[in-house]
């Protein structure tokens, strides 16, 4: 019975990503000229420029080294277009296995920036998550300095 569930899951994923191509074009055409409103945190609330509380709905990606196949522009287009995601969280796996940021920083940076760049193209907010079970302050400073320079 488990093989049938696995087969169904694979078929659904193929169908889901096959439909994403048209969503990508539509999102790029509609979102290219738009700029996302600035948001800020006041106390415990996310607020827009008018001071109204904002609630975003979205998707959190799993760690990049475990699910890199989803860290691409067509997945972002599908999630923003068909699912209506307004925010995407790209999770940088820092130190869990041999494919994590500590051992393969270029791979991790490529995965995360691919999602963020596609989020910008699709008019979606992006959160970059430095996901580490250990304190790696120096590596985090270096990484976020690079991200801040790229996305300022």
Tell where the protein language model's regions lie, with residue ranges.
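Aromatic-lined substrate-binding rim segments of carbohydrate-active enzymes
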Residues: 72-145
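Bacterial N-terminal signal peptides that target proteins for export
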Residues: 1-8
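Active-site-proximal helices and loops of the catalytic beta/alpha 8
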Residues: 28-41, 49, 111-118, 122-127, ...
